[in-house]
Amino acid sequence: MEKHAEPEKSLGDKEFQEKELHEKPAPAASEDISGDSSVNKEDGPDPINDNYLSGLRLAVVMFALCISNFLVALDTTILATAVPKISSDFNSLQDVGWYTSSYLLTNCAFQLFYGKLYTRFKVKIVFTVAMIIFEIGSLLCGVAPNSPVFIFGRAIAGLGSAGAFSGALIIVIHSVQAEKRAQYSGMIVGMYGLASVAAPLIGGAFTDHVTWRWCFYINLPCGGVAIAGLLFFFHSPPQAAVKETAAGLWAKIAKFDPFGTFFFLCSMICLLLALQMGGSTYPFTDARIIVLLVLFGLLLVAFIVVQFFDKNATIPPRVMKNRSVAFGMIYMFCVGAQFLVLVTFMPIWFQGVRAMSATDSGIRSLPILLSNTFCVVLAGALVSMTGYYIPFMWASVVLTSIGAGLLTTLTVDASTGKWVGYQIIAGIGGGLGYQQGISVAQTVLKGSDMTIGTAVMVFVQLLGGTILVSAANNILVTRLVENLERLAPHINPEIILRAGASGIKTAVSEADYPFVIEAYNIALTKTFQIALIVSCLGAIGAAGVEWKRGSKKGDSDEPAIMAV
């Protein structure tokens, strides 16, 4: 390597050494240590450009990103109030589970593939295509004449939504300085909490007063406005482009890690199918479920092996070997799991134990949703101001553990102060830590690795919620049956299961009702124990992340290592 002349300096010249430390360029994190020349060496240490957005351009781009992710998040939860009418129109009660799982399956399975696309193509192009796919899926759902077409539309919408969240966070990286990224990322993450609040109200209004199809039609004009705003006001920076040196069709295809992508997609499909059918359609001891779980394990191992030997790996080994990334993934898995478990089963507690309607249960779940949304945005602003994210990770672990633990103590006659206060504690904790794994990835990784790291964090957060909600649901059903056999042995559990949470009061006699809701309450508090356990396990992730300070206002983009 050619040596450059260094200016003369004395060993005691502390001022010069500090200046040199700050000015010395860091090696490109995206550079392949195996010598792969296909990676663009112009990626640099950080996707920094001289054209960060401000004023009207930044406002329009952020509005477009927030609207896009609000729609994607809304699509995940809006079905709760519309499913009864949809299943009635299609005469397809047996397909209800697939209305959500088909969306989650493609959303989860294609997260890492989008991460690869964002490193190979201009971010604006990939994000726009993802949103167009989401819009097409929404249109198919809106015009669906039967249940199979509706399920297909949900799968297409999930395929598009997979690239929306991580893509929005990557666009933020290219739009604002490093010290502002946590603040603006918090605005995008906050859209998921806002959508959780709005979904039951919007879904209920459309279903009751217009038609459930407008739950999906609404995505078309709003999504179109968001796409237009991004197309006209955001320009992908040069760093997003990759120099193409491959010759031949297969060489070009190989850039996208086809074998790794195949193994990963198939493993996720096997896992999600097992979770969807296990405990409901078939018992977990059924040979079909066991085969799916075994295939998931084998395919996942194959994916990991490919990542270590393929120079075009979807997740480069250097990313996975990074201590902060590895423990950050554990943390994000736990954060995603505890939050989704609580926001899924709190409305069921209100419907099943307190005999409230779907809309009323959604309103009474606002304490956890609003406190979570507020604290996501607040934490983003505070991380931008201070540069520190680990204190918020620990605050999240402590508060979510306390909140989930208190929720496990709920009784049938719990006072309003208890269920409101417990939700607020859990919501504050979840909000403070919800995006911190993303902050970790954007601090310890640089260049195209930052893009991959962001996609990985989003993926494990979604995967945690998907797996643990399924596990919690199976625990709910199992414990409910056990409790009914103990408290009301003369009642057929199948009657209660078919009635659902909102139909218990009409399914049993007035004399049996107190015993049934007691059984329901005990079973539901067991699901809150799942949230408590994963909240506590989040401490493992927080403890393993290196104590680094990201950029704060007034800093350069280079993070300062405070302690290891």
From Swiss-Prot:
Residues 1-25 have a biased composition (Basic and acidic residues). The keyword Oxidoreductase does not apply. Its main location: membrane. Keywords: Cell membrane, Glycoprotein, Membrane, Transmembrane, Transmembrane helix, Transport. Residues 1-46 are annotated as: Disordered. The chain crosses the membrane at residues 58-78, 96-118, 125-145, 156-176, 186-206, 214-234, 259-279, 289-309, 330-350, 361-383, 395-415, 452-472. Glycans are attached at N312, N322. The gene is hpm6. It comes from the Eukaryota. Belongs to the major facilitator superfamily. TCR/Tet family. This is Efflux pump hmp6. It is found in: Cell membrane. Efflux pump that might be required for efficient secretion of hypothemycin or other secondary metabolies produced by the hypothemycin gene cluster. One of its GO terms (molecular function) is transmembrane transporter activity. It is a multi-pass membrane protein. One of its GO terms (cellular component) is plasma membrane. It comes from Hypomyces subiculosus (Nectria subiculosa).
